[in-house]
């Protein structure tokens, strides 16, 4: 009934999945955005790598959720959402293939614009492990080219709806991310 994504070196925190399912069903949400904690290579646990605090709301539209991403309250992590399976099937939006970087951003930009209700869980439900040599830390010409393709498609999607000032600032940060 629900779909969760899990990176191979990450983990869901105890009782999180039941909390997410309960939240989705109580709010009749097509997606649930949830908070997470970060496990660093030295073993310490810290804040999530997102600039501002997690949104203090119970539900929103998908468009409002996109604005939370642009304002850096939510990160571009597809694993930080739970999806209603039937919603995914009905949309026919597949996870982008052939992208080495920013595929999460492209997927979320497409799917959130089709989502009428997103619920939020501010309690950390996921442990995101930062590892040395991860794919997101590797820079090659193919990786950069892939990221540019993702960003180009995201810009096309946003501009077709009329992009916001927040989007413009956000896309600049994403371009800078490619180079760091």
Residue ranges, per PLM feature:
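Nucleotide-sugar donor-binding/catalytic module of glycosyltransferases
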Residues: 1-161
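Non-catalytic, C-terminal membrane-associated alpha-helical segments of glycosyltransferases
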Residues: 169-180
